[in-house]
A protein has these predicted regions:
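Catalytic metal-binding acidic patch
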Residues: 1-28
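Internal, well-ordered alpha/beta segment that forms a basic, Gly-enriched binding/recognition surface
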Residues: 2, 9-11, 35-72, 79-92
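Generic structural signal for hydrophobic core residues of well-folded globular domains
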Residues: 10, 48, 135-142, 216
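Conserved His + Asp/Glu catalytic blocks
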Residues: 20-32, 48, 53
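Short acidic (Asp/Glu) patches
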Residues: 29-30, 41, 60-62, 111-114
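Conserved nucleotidyltransferase catalytic core and NTase-mimicking acidic/glycine-rich helix/loop elements
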Residues: 68-207
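A cross-kingdom marker for long, charged
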Residues: 203-218
Length: 218
């Protein structure tokens, strides 16, 4: 039912560093439209700092392959995944709000990936699904729910119906409009709080990066 998108984290060689090669960051789209994101470990750890859901999720998956050379360091990240996912809560909410706005703008936008849905429903059911799912995630995250729990929807049947395009265009427009309004209010209210990034997480990310890079070139 869902695409299987993959993240592939790469470690630069000594030659890459010595020759000042840019860190790898690219996406490969497979024939079945599934995506593989290739990203240098240095850049990937930066995505943790930016609190992007799409990149934080790998800390919570049960399906991964790890080079044994780096497993000890990776397991440190897994052990601290909740702390990492709450490293900078304001930025996390701002990032989720930004993603929500993008989904809202994409609802009726004519793009190659939307053509089939627009012809069928007049809107992208997939984008509406993402928007409503983000609203639920933000609601629970801003109320102190663990990241692991936030990832598990409490409205599976409804969201499945949305994703399958069971609702007409007028419903979709109203659902999207009211959702983005609620998200904006939640984000604004939360970001007024006095919350600082967690220094211990910053120290952990720096230490893991240092150790991985050291192992890679020695």
């Amino acid at each position: 039912f869902s695409d299987v998108d993959t993240k592939l984290i790469v470690v630069p060689s000594f030659k890459d560093i010595a020759m000042n090669k840019s860190p790898i960051s690219t996406t490969h789209v497979r024939k079945n439209d599934e995506h593989i994101d290739f990203k240098d470990i240095r850049l990937y750890l930066q995505t943790f700092r930016k609190q992007n859901i799409n990149f934080l999720e790998i800390l919570f998956t049960k399906f991964y392959i790890c080079n044994t050379m780096y497993c000890d360091e990776w397991n440190r990240l897994i052990a601290a995944r909740e702390q990492i996912a709450h490293y900078n809560e304001k930025r996390a909410v701002q990032t989720m709000y930004g993603m929500s706005l993008e989904k809202y703008k994409q609802l009726e936008k004519d793009t190659p990936s939307h053509k089939e849905e627009l012809a069928k429903y007049g809107y992208s059911a997939k984008e509406l699904h993402h928007l409503l799912r983000l609203e639920e995630f933000i609601y629970r995250y801003t109320r102190g729910t663990s990241y692991e729990e936030c990832r598990q929807t409490k409205a599976a049947d409804y969201l499945t119906a949305v994703k399958l395009g069971y609702f007409n265009l007028n419903f979709a427009r109203e659902a999207a409009r009211s959702s983005i309004e609620r998200i904006e209010k939640m984000a604004n209210d939360f970001c007024q709080k006095d919350i600082e990034p967690h220094k211990e997480v910053e120290d952990l990310l720096n230490d893991v990066q240092y150790n991985i890079m050291k192992k890679a070139i020695t």
